[in-house]
Amino acid sequence: MQTTHSNPSSPSLTLGIETSCDETGIALYHSEKGLIAHTLYSQIKLHAEYGGVVPELASRDHIRKITPLIQETLKKGQVSAKDITGIAYTAGPGLMGALLSGASVARSLAFAWQIPAIAIHHMEGHLLAPMLEETQPEFPFVCLLVSGGHTMIIRVDGIGRYKLLGDTLDDAAGEAFDKTAKMLGLGYPGGPEVSKLALHGQTDRYKFPRPMVDRPGLDMSFSGLKTFTLNTWLKAKESGDDSEQTKADICRAFEVAVADTLSIKCKRALEQEGLNRLVVSGGVSANREIRAKLDALMAKRKGSAFYPRLEFCTDNGAMIAYAGSKRLEAGQFSDLNFACQPRWDLESLEPIDPIEVV
C-alpha cells in the first residue's frame, strides 16, 4: 500500500466491490452525501444443495454477476463511470478465488478509468459498517466482530488503529451455529435456522456451558460447546425424544450460551479498556438473543451499543465502499501489482488519523 497522495479537496465517489465468500456486493459511497446506492446478490440457493459454500462455484458466480451489478448500482445512484473517483475492493480474508474475482475487476476498471484503487480488509469493512448509520460511534470503542469465520474483540482508536484483545481459539461463533444446524438436520444457511427454531424453545430445559468464562482473559472457544450440543442431541435421540420441540429447546440453550459468553467477554473488555462504547458487527450480530444480551449489558453500564442495520450485518459492498472512501481520502491507495490474502492480520493495517474521519 502506498500513501503518496494528498487529501483531495473536492468531493469523492467510491465504488465498493465485495466478493470474499458467497455474496457479490456493489455500492457507491459519496464523501459528502454518504451511501447513494448499493446492490447485493446472494449465492445461498446455489450452495444450499451442498450444505455449504463450494469455492469454485462461488468464484464463477461472482464473475457472472459483478459487471451487471456494477451497471445496476450506477443506474440506482444516477451516476456514470466518469463520476467515480476511486475503487475499493475486498482483498482478504476470504476464499482466494472469490477474492480474485472482485480484485481483478476492480484493478482492471481502475486502470481503464485512470483512478486509484484500494485493497480493503474484509473485517475492517464489518468493523466500520455501523459508521453507515445516522448515529455513529465515536472513537475509541470496543468492537465485537462476530461472523461465520471470525469472533474477535478489538479495541478501536481510529481507522487502522486496532488492538486485538481476544480471539477464538477454534471455531468462530457463526461456524458453531452452522455446525449445530447441520447436526440437527436444519436448513442452510444454518445460523438463521437455529435462531428461528430457538424462538420456540424452552429456556430452562437444558443448561449448556459458557466456555472459557471461568478463566481470565478475553479469548473464546466454541468447539466444546458444539460438542456438548451434539452429545445432548444424541442422548435425546437415544431416549426416543427427537421431536421438533426438543430441537427447539436445544437451539435455545445453545443460542443463550453463546450470547451469554459473548456478553461476559465484552463486559471484561470494556472494563479492561476503560471504555463504555461497544460496536457489534459481522453476520452473527444480526442475532436477536445476542443483541438483547449486549443491549442489556450496555444499559446496565449506562453505555451505548452500536450495530449495523440488518442488511449490512452480512457481507455487503457498502461497508467496503465506506472503508475505501476513508482510506482514499487519507491518500492511501494500492499499486497495480495487487495481491489477495486469504488470511490477513487486522492489526497490520496502516492507520489514518482519526481526526480526519467524521
From Swiss-Prot:
Binding residue positions for Fe cation: H122, H126, D315
Domain of life: Bacteria
Protein location: Cytoplasm
Main location: cytoplasm
GO terms for cellular component: cytoplasm
GO MF terms, alphabetically ordered: iron ion binding; N(6)-L-threonylcarbamoyladenine synthase activity
Binding-site residues, substrate: L145, V146, S147, G148, G149, D178, G191, N287
EC number(s) recorded for this UniProt protein: 2.3.1.234
Cofactor binding: number and manner: Binds 1 Fe(2+) ion per subunit.
InterPro entries assigned: ATPase_NBD, Gcp-like_dom, KAE1/TsaD, Peptidase_M22_CS, TsaD
Catalyzed reaction equations: L-threonylcarbamoyladenylate + adenosine(37) in tRNA = N(6)-L-threonylcarbamoyladenosine(37) in tRNA + AMP + H(+)
Cofactors: Fe(2+)
Task performed by this protein: Required for the formation of a threonylcarbamoyl group on adenosine at position 37 (t(6)A37) in tRNAs that read codons beginning with adenine. Is involved in the transfer of the threonylcarbamoyl moiety of threonylcarbamoyl-AMP (TC-AMP) to the N6 group of A37, together with TsaE and TsaB. TsaD likely plays a direct catalytic role in this reaction.
Protein family membership: Belongs to the KAE1 / TsaD family.
Name under which the protein is recorded: tRNA N6-adenosine threonylcarbamoyltransferase
Organism: Hydrogenovibrio crunogenus (strain DSM 25203 / XCL-2) (Thiomicrospira crunogena)
Lineage, broadest ranks: Bacteria, Pseudomonadati, Pseudomonadota, Gammaproteobacteria, Thiotrichales
Gene, per the UniProt record: tsaD
